[in-house]
């Protein structure tokens, strides 16, 4: 929101302000999801390829399985945390 001045927002009608704010919130959410995916992928890649030299442009079957399992565990954990937080809010 730092790139949109308060004066510019104030000059818009209420509907346009709401649309812009919803768009900004949506983009922020997308950015957070992309950052999480990047962080999980980076962490899992390092875990699954520790002390292994990269010898080709593709993963072998054990590396691929390790990455899949690692990412799935973190996604499952995130889902459980979100569900627990949603349950706590009720």
UniProtKB/Swiss-Prot annotation:
Protein's UniProt keywords contain Chaperone: yes
Gene3D superfamilies in UniProt: Mitochondrial import inner membrane translocase subunit tim13 like domains (1.10.287.810)
Cellular location(s): Mitochondrion inner membrane
One annotated Gene Ontology cellular component of this protein: mitochondrial intermembrane space protein transporter complex
A molecular-function term among this protein's GO annotations: protein transporter activity
Family (UniProt): Belongs to the small Tim family.
Assembly notes: Heterohexamer; composed of 3 copies of TIM8 and 3 copies of TIM13, named soluble 70 kDa complex. Associates with the TIM22 complex, whose core is composed of TIM22 and TIM54. Interacts with the transmembrane regions of multi-pass transmembrane proteins in transit.
Function: Mitochondrial intermembrane chaperone that participates in the import and insertion of some multi-pass transmembrane proteins into the mitochondrial inner membrane. Also required for the transfer of beta-barrel precursors from the TOM complex to the sorting and assembly machinery (SAM complex) of the outer membrane. Acts as a chaperone-like protein that protects the hydrophobic precursors from aggregation and guide them through the mitochondrial intermembrane space.
Protein name, UniProt field: Mitochondrial import inner membrane translocase subunit TIM8
Organism: Debaryomyces hansenii (strain ATCC 36239 / CBS 767 / BCRC 21394 / JCM 1990 / NBRC 0083 / IGC 2968) (Yeast)
């Amino acid at each position: 929101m730092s790139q949109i001045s308060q004066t510019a927002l104030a000059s818009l009608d209420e509907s346009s302000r709401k649309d812009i704010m919803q768009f900004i919130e949506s983009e922020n959410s997308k950015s957070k999801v992309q950052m999480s995916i990047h962080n999980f992928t980076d962490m899992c890649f390092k875990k699954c390829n520790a002390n292994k030299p990269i010898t080709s442009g593709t993963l072998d079957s054990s590396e691929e399985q390790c990455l899949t399992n690692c990412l799935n565990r973190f996604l499952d954990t995130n889902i459980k945390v979100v569900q627990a937080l949603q349950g706590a809010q009720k």
